Amino acid sequence: MNLQKINDEVFIAQDAIVKIGGGELAFLKDQARTNLRKRARICAHKSNDDALHEMLIAISAQSYIHPHKHLGKSESFHIVDGVVDVVVFDDRGEITEIIELGDARSGRNFFYRLSESAFHTLLIRTDFLVVHEVTNGPFLRDKTVLADFAPAEAQTVEAAEYIRQVAARAAAFMKHGN
């Protein structure tokens, strides 16, 4: 596959027919291991302006996904490899739902679609998560809202502690079913 490197995290597939297999998964995981934010993606769409965005994304369990929401967008995940809990929050940072996902071998659901704008983050339960994400374009940075109830990505110590707290809250949420 011909890839155009945009930066250490983003690669654009240049072929008219995009095919992704084990070699590309290994490539993405290697890229994610070595970059600062511990994630990497291959975009099947060619431009931020495309109406449909499809990405294969490898995310290390060491990566902090700042709780965020996308205004006016839907997104779906199909889990290719790994296990994750998608934690959904209200605007105050209270957990409203946990979506337990995994690849087909895991016994968990392997697909979800978030049709309405809601804050969410990922608790990755395996060393790596590989997802096929689909969302509507265009990508406009100002349509992604970062939750003010969570630390910024640059606050690495606080972010790590926050994720530990979210994991504990998520466990209690799942235990009590609320």
Predicted regions: what is each one?
Residues 1-52, 97-104, 159-178:
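A short, N-terminal "cap"/entry segment at the start of jelly-roll beta-barrel domains
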Residues 38, 56-73, 116:
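Conserved short histidine dyad/triad with adjacent acidic residue
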Residues 49-50, 72, 127:
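Short strand-connecting beta-turns/loops that link adjacent beta-strands
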Residues 49-52, 60-64, 83-85, 92-94:
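Short, charged/polar surface micro-motifs in flexible loops or helix N-caps
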Residues 66-68, 86-88, 112-114, 120-125, ...:
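Short beta-strand His + acidic residue motifs that chelate non-heme Fe in jelly-roll/DSBH
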Residues 72-92:
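Glycine- and acidic-residue-biased ligand/ion/polar-headgroup-sensing regions
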Residues 76, 90-120:
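Short acidic-glycine-tyrosine-enriched beta hairpin
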Residues 96-98, 104-106, 121-178:
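Double-stranded beta-helix
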